Regions:
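Alpha-helical scaffold/interaction cores of sigma-54-like transcription cofactors
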Residues: 1-165, 172, 250-815
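Short, low-complexity, charge-dense intrinsically disordered segments
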Residues: 166-168, 175-213, 220-238, 242-249
Length: 815
């Protein structure tokens, strides 16, 4: 029976808690993760944990035409003391595959740019489809500097391959064919070479795949060339660089051409196929490699971390090819040998070719690039010439403070602004704030203005308030700046800005136009298999009927979780759990849950860079017109410390905008979000009756039920109302004590520390406004900072552990 997936929640290894292992004699470089969607059957946790147990000290990653999985493997490998070797597998439109490993930061940038080119445009220059990637050998040759290539040979070394090549290789191949014939015939005819070249060029007609028309059976440019008076001269002239031809030849005959066109191609991948002739096949590969000045490189090309994952891989293969496991036939792997094998096992298999093992070790040692080398800078366009970003930010902040506080900036606010600006400068964040300011200013400068509002932890920042990114005065509401940014923790701030949902596209296209598509991209969102999707697709691949898979899907309660409850299957679907096939389907489904299905675009998280974003991470096209997004999601971005700009859509802002327009049109009242009266008694009378249908934040059944019980009479009461109807306060038994104290049914008692531990009002200053009941995350952080003397980093960890229901044991660590 397949074993359950090893998830991050089940890994009991402290990051950095293990010493680095001794160098192994071999490094696996052909590994794919589950981010080679429906091709890799193990995630980064499984792979890194298994690699550590097998004795590896380094581990390569080579997902197909993508860098989507490198950050996760990077993080998990480092946590286990392993060195991640960052790379990918390039699959060309000609049908050839290469392992590609950059040796430094510049080479990594070229590799990302290559993948971006394949994902953003077709070979004809048209807009690329989402998820597709067209990379030609010519494109690869333009980006190989510093990128070590390992050619993946076909299983059958005698197979005849057809590839599209630039016209200038036709004479090269013709000369090769001519020399072969001459060696056989022992003759050398003067002038024969040019004749043979012309014959080779003209013979292309029969080698091009058939089509419906006659002359168009060959590429149009080549056909025009052959109709010219001197086709040989046309083929050789440099003014025809884009003429291409189709070349058909055995793999061995293509190898010289590939070696000549790809100067960093120095290795052929050698692996066991377990078809009975592996020794002879690898020996022949070794001979071919030596003939071109190359070497073979050992790899098992693992598709999963352990043999037990082979059934899941079969299911993934069936899903990918839209068939069933029973009908997949030769599409499936013939055995379970494509798992991650240890260095000792690989040394046994490649005992006749120790240089193949050494080649893998040497290549891994040469490729020292790490994702930690990525240095991220925000665009410079937001800063006028002659001004430093920090100086310009301070100038805008103090000008905004004068507008926010027309009667004079209070001393406490001025002190807060100085402290925040100093920290922003120390953390090198001025451009980030200037970029947000630029986007918000664009929205408000439109005619009519696009309604927008900053929210989230950015409301804790006085700088954001003075820049008019947010509309909440943190001094008035005693908000904690450490919730937003802290010097103690190494993570970027997060500023979320909501825009009218009907006009957000204007903002997005402005960002693309201002910074360019190669410097701006939306974050990705990883679409994972949830229980219902998993049971439907696994069941279909395993041959279950649609009725059965639908019945099984209905037994899943909720959209999350990592298991299918057998009791629900038996009781609600009426199925016999003693059926071994059904139990196997359920076990495979549990393995599939949580696996990535594909990438989608984030709702609005933008990454902007000063240099080419395509040299930091590959960019691909979205399903929506004129949308492109990077291959990393918000967790990947956070892990690397890269900042993002959240350009979000909020339907209620559109509703409010139309409301304000109607007030202006019919009643002559010119109101904005900032000038709408906050303390209107008639409005609070309606809210106390629960009359809030369609009112943002208080329209749910739970909120409508709470309103008559809490009876808000001011704006801050509404803040408490929205916050208290949350899982945390409800499960923490904070709702009833607060309501009783609000109604006078319970005394308000706030504990005070002893004289030796702090001032008597230490907690009163934090909890007085909520009647001694902690409701907000900021209150928990403030208590930890003042009473428990936590550092900012520890207080933020406490906040995250309280807010995240999956963080079992994190609170106990901080006790």
């Amino acid at each position: 029976m397949p074993e359950p997936a090893l998830t991050p929640e089940r890994r009991h290894v402290e990051p950095g808690g293990l010493p680095p292992p001794a160098p192994a004699p071999f490094v696996e470089l052909g590994l794919v993760t589950c981010f080679s969607f429906l091709r890799g059957a193990s995630d980064a946790v499984d792979l890194a944990t298994t690699a550590r147990a097998l004795g590896y000290d380094a581990l390569g990653v080579a997902d197909a035409n993508t860098m989507a999985g490198v950050v996760r493997l990077h993080s998990e490998a480092l946590a286990l003391g392993l060195r991640p070797v960052i790379g990918c597998r390039i699959e060309t439109v000609e049908g050839l595959g290469f392992l590609a490993y950059p040796q430094d930061r510049a080479a990594y940038g070229r590799l990302c740019r290559l993948i971006s080119a394949g994902r953003m445009a077709r070979l004809d220059g048209e807009w690329q489809d989402k998820g597709a990637c067209d990379i030609s050998l010519a494109m690869l040759a333009e980006h190989v500097e510093g990128v070590h290539l390992v050619l993946l040979p076909p299983d059958d070394l005698d197979a005849v391959l057809t590839i599209a090549v630039e016209s200038n290789v036709v004479p090269f191949v013709a000369r090769g064919d001519a020399e072969t014939r001459r060696r056989k015939e022992g003759v050398r005819a003067e002038g024969a070479e040019e004749t043979e070249i012309a014959e080779m060029a003209c013979s292309r007609r029969s080698r091009v795949p058939s089509s419906t028309s006659g002359e168009d059976e060959m590429p149009a440019a080549l056909a025009a060339c052959l109709r010219s008076p001197d086709p040989l001269r046309s083929l050789r002239e440099p003014e025809n660089p884009h003429i291409s031809a189709t070349l058909t030849a055995p793999f061995a005959d293509l190898l010289p051409h590939l070696a000549a066109q790809l100067p960093t191609l120095k290795h052929l991948a050698a692996s066991y196929l377990y078809t009975g002739d592996d020794l002879a096949r690898i020996a022949r590969l070794d001979e071919l490699a030596r003939g071109q000045g190359m070497a073979i490189l050992a790899t098992n090309l693992p598709l999963y971390h352990a043999p037990q994952r082979r059934p899941l891989h079969d299911v993934m293969t069936a899903i990918r090819h839209k068939t069933t496991v029973a009908r997949a036939g030769h599409l499936l792997q013939p055995n379970a040998e494509r798992h991650l094998k240890g260095p000792e096992e690989m040394a046994r298999l490649f005992a006749p070719w120790p240089h193949a093992l050494q080649a893998a070790r040497d290549l891994a040692d040469r490729c020292r690039f790490s994702l930690e080398e990525l240095r991220y800078e925000y665009p410079e366009e937001t800063c006028p010439d002659g001004l430093e970003p920090q100086d310009y930010l301070e100038q805008l902040t103090w000008a905004g403070a004068a507008r926010r506080y027309p009667g004079g900036v209070p001393d406490s606010v001025a002190d807060t602004l100085r402290r925040e600006l100093d920290l922003i400068g120390k953390l090198h964040l001025p451009r980030y704030f200037l970029t947000i300011k630029d986007i918000v200013d664009f929205a408000r400068a439109q005619d009519p203005p696009i309604l927008c509002q900053g929210r989230g932890s950015a409301a804790n920042s006085a700088v954001c308030y003075c820049l008019e990114i947010t509309a909440v005065d943190p001094a008035k509401h005693a908000l904690l700046f450490d919730r937003f940014i802290s010097e103690d923790r190494n993570e970027p701030p997060d500023i979320d800005v909501d825009f009218e949902h009907e006009r957000r596209e204007e903002v997005i296209q402005y960002i693309y136009a201002r910074y360019g598509r190669h410097r701006a991209g939306l974050c990705a969102t990883v679409i994972h298999y949830r229980p219902r999707m998993a049971i439907r697709e696994v069941g279909k691949a395993m041959g279950l009927s649609e009725d059965v898979t639908a019945a099984l899907a209905k037994t899943v309660w909720g959209g999350h979780g990592r298991s299918i409850k057998e009791a629900h299957v038996e009781r609600e679907a009426g199925m016999d759990l003693s059926d071994p096939h059904l139990r196997r389907v359920l076990a495979l489904t549990e393995q599939m849950i949580g696996m990535p299905r594909h990438l989608s675009q984030h709702v609005g998280g933008f990454i902007l860079t000063q240099g080419l974003l395509t040299e930091t991470v590959p960019i691909g096209n979205g399903a929506m017109p004129d949308r492109s997004f990077i291959e990393w999601d918000k967790d990947d971005i956070d892990a690397l410390g890269i900042l993002k700009v959240d350009v979000l859509a909020l339907g209620m802002l559109t509703c409010i905008r139309k409301c304000l327009d109607l007030l202006q049109a019919h009643h002559g009242q010119d109101l904005t979000l900032a000038t709408v009266p906050r303390e209107d008694p008639v409005v609070y009378d309606m809210l106390c009756k629960g009359d809030s249908l369609g009112v943002f934040q208080v329209e749910s059944r739970a909120q409508m039920n709470m309103l008559p019980r809490l009876r808000p009479r001011c704006f801050y009461d509404l803040v408490i109302e929205v916050a208290i109807v949350r899982p945390g306060p409800i499960q923490g038994d904070m709702v009833h004590p607060y309501l009783k104290r609000r109604r006078g049914e319970e005394r308000v008692e706030i504990p005070a520390p002893g004289p030796q531990h702090g001032p008597p009002d230490e907690l009163t200053s934090i909890l007085a406004r909520t009647l001694g009941v902690p409701i907000f995350q900021e209150q928990a952080m403030k208590i930890a900072l003042d009473a428990a003397k936590f550092t900012g980093l520890e207080a933020n960890r406490l906040r995250k552990s309280i807010a995240t229901f999956r963080s079992r044991g994190m609170v106990a660590e901080l006790e």
